[in-house]
Amino acid sequence: MFVLVFVGCLSQASAQYDDWKHSGSMYLVTTSAGANLPASAVEKNFPLLIRLNKDYFDFSQAKPRGEDVRFSSNGKPLAYQIERWDAEGGNAAVWVRIPTIKGNDQQAIQMHWGNEKVSGESNGEQVFRTTEGFAGVWHLGDNLEDATSNNLDGVNRPDKPTTNTTGIIGDAQEFGVNKILDIRLTDVYDIIS
C-alpha cells in the first residue's frame, strides 16, 4: 500500500508547464509513516492509481473530461491514463506510470491542469506497456476495452452478460456461471492444448 498526500495548488510549475494555470503536488511516501518499504526496495514502471475528489480538487478548473491534466516528476512528463473522470460527481481515477519507486523515501508527483489550449494525452498503452509484462489490463467499468496495445477487448456474451457493480478500487463487473466476459486471447497468443 502506498500513501499519497495531495497538497493544494502551488503557483510554481516547471517551465514545461508554464501555460497551465494550476498545479499541485502529491507525495508518494514509502517511509514508516507511509507504505513502510525497506530502503532496499525498488519498483520500476509502477502504474499508480491516483484518485481525485471534489473535497480537495476543484473540477471546474480543468477541462470537462480532464483533457488538460498532466503529471510530472522532477519536471519530466509521466504517462497516464484517465480511467474515469466525473466532473459533475466530483471524482476521478487516473493511472500514472511512476518510473521508479524507492523504499524508505518520499517522492513528489506534480499534477498540472487549467490549460484550454491542449488536447488530451491519456494513454493506457504507455502506462501498461506490454514490453513490461502487461498482457492485458481491463478496468472493468462500463468500458470493457483492454488498456494495452494488445487490444484484447472484452465482449459480453449476449446470453450471459456480466453486470456492473462496485469493486474495491472503483467500478467493476460481476461474474458468475451465468455472467461471462469473453476475451479473444487467440488473436494475440498461440494457445496450445
Residue ranges with predicted function:
Residues 1-9:
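Bacterial N-terminal signal peptides
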Residues 14, 117-179, 183-193:
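Extracytoplasmic low-complexity segments
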Residues 14-142:
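Alpha-mannosidase-like glycoside hydrolase catalytic domains involved in N-glycan trimming
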